[in-house]
Curated annotation (Swiss-Prot):
Region annotated Disordered, chain positions: 1-23
Functional description taken from the UniProt entry: Binds as a heterodimer with protein bS6 to the central domain of the 16S rRNA, where it helps stabilize the platform of the 30S subunit.
Keyword Transmembrane helix: no
Keyword RNA-binding: yes
Transmembrane segments: none
GO CC terms: ribonucleoprotein complex; ribosome
Entry-linked Gene3D superfamilies: Ribosomal protein S18
Name this polypeptide is given: Small ribosomal subunit protein bS18
InterPro entries: Ribosomal_bS18, Ribosomal_bS18_sf
A GO BP entry: translation
Amino acid sequence: MKPMRQKNTRAQGNKSISNALASKRKVSKNQVVFFDYRDERKLKRFINDQGKIIPRRITGLTAKEQNLLTHSVKWARFLAVIPYVADEYK
């Protein structure tokens, strides 16, 4: 008889994905994260070319950090520090 192979469970499949994404973290784990709505250069690191906020799974931020980032980006857009949409999409 052939030995039975283990099925890939969802939990096993996600382990390799989470390990790969952990290295993509744009902010150091030890660094205290503070997003200032006036810091245009720092906010633009987390916005793609269409003007959308990059999701957590790509940036590597925690839920709390992503929430602070989103709030800062939205407030900066409201105050016209950064544009809502990129120029080529207007």
